Curated annotation (Swiss-Prot):
Ranges in coiled-coil conformation: none
Gene label: mprA
SMART domains assigned to the protein according to its UniProt record, in alphabetical order: REC, Trans_reg_C
Gene3D superfamilies in the cross-refs: 3.40.50.2300, 6.10.250.690, Winged helix-like DNA-binding domain superfamily/Winged helix DNA-binding domain
UniProt KW Phosphoprotein keyword: yes
Function: Member of the two-component regulatory system MprB/MprA which contributes to maintaining a balance among several systems involved in stress resistance and is required for establishment and maintenance of persistent infection in the host. Functions as a transcriptional regulator that recognizes a 19-bp nucleotide motif comprizing two loosely conserved 8-bp direct DNA-binding motif repeats separated by a 3-bp spacer region.
Record localization: Cytoplasm
GO biological process, alphabetically ordered: regulation of DNA-templated transcription
Organism: Mycobacterium leprae (strain TN)
One GO cellular component, as annotated: protein-DNA complex
PTM: Phosphorylated and dephosphorylated by MprB.
Modified residue annotations for 4-aspartylphosphate: 46
Disulphide-bonded residues: none
Protein name: Response regulator MprA
Amino acid sequence: MRILAVDDDRAVRESLRRSLSFNGYSVELANDGVEALEMVARDRPDALVLDVMMPRLDGLEVCRQLRSTGDDLPILVLTARDSVSERVAGLDAGADDYLPKPFALEELLARIRALLRRTKPDDAAESVAMSFSDLTLDPVTREVARGQRWISLTRTEFALLEMLIANPRRVLTRSRILEEVWGFDFPTSGNALEVYVGYLRRKTEADGESRLIHTVRGVGYVLRETPP
């Protein structure tokens, strides 16, 4: 697996190179966002590890530009700022995950593994689309529709909706969703799940459709026609 690591701090770049290479990844480095976009266009990696604060073009703008072209390259954002607003900004820009600095190597590796797992095709996936009410999801073609309206989802949004639609009317705990969709236990203070539920609600209700994804306070979420 090829990882492109992008950071304007040479020491951080070299640390990422050593750590990732030691764990079996092929690693390429970029100094800033402009160079990163050029390298992705020239030879697309399997995942992107991206710092936020960089000269010329920051990490969030790199995310936006890639997503605006429909590129679903797995992106892990590294940020020295760990406020809720900063994390939400990263997810809004199109990042699949975020990791505050300083970080433990074990957590970096776990998050990269989780990202790469979500990109692998499921050979055993059912070819028949799943549906609930007027919402349909095809795990093979990765097409999603609400009635006759097609819905474009990011990789993480799709994984979350797929879990919900595979468990209709079942209350799924927050911890179970985080473990299955993100591939590891998120800190309880993290709000990535809430952010992505918000994204899914906006997209599945964009034409005024009724809400299907409901919050079960203190527990998690459920896909059902009416509030619990």
